[in-house]
Amino acid sequence: MTIFQRIDDEAGRSEAAIAANGARSYRRMIWVDEGDADAATKVAVWGAAPGLYTYPARPLAESFIVMEGEADCQVAGEAIRRIGPGDIVNVPVNAPISLEVLKSFRKFAMVVPKG
């Protein structure tokens, strides 16, 4: 197990979502629970270039803290909120989320499948 990683290192990063404008995001897995990969709790750092990233309702809960950047965030059709460094967002099970990334964005997230 690697004890130390620089988050901006390219090694270990994988592409994640693509924004409506074609901008890209990436993730670096920090920790994955043992067992079935689809049912495992995962911890990762997610980074994204400016753009709109939308996710449909999914059978998982997610909590994240914004490390850098700024985005307009909407969870489960509630009011859009501007989020930035230090903000904590909780996405309930089966709640859609959209992030309109305004400035290069990075979050530390934990995803817990609830299928």
Language model feature labels by segment:
Residues 55, 73, 107-109:
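Short hydrophobic/aromatic-rich beta-strand segments that constitute the beta-sheet cores
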Residues 1-40, 44:
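A short, N-terminal "cap"/entry segment at the start of jelly-roll beta-barrel domains
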Residues 85, 93-115:
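Ligand-binding loop in jelly-roll beta-barrel domains
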Residues 74-76, 100:
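A generic structural motif
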Residues 49, 59-60, 79, 95, ...:
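A generic "binding-loop/recognition-motif" signal
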Residues 48, 57-73:
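Short, conserved beta-strand element in jelly-roll/cupin
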Residues 31, 42-58, 92-93:
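Conserved short histidine dyad/triad with adjacent acidic residue
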Residues 77-93:
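Short acidic-glycine-tyrosine-enriched beta hairpin
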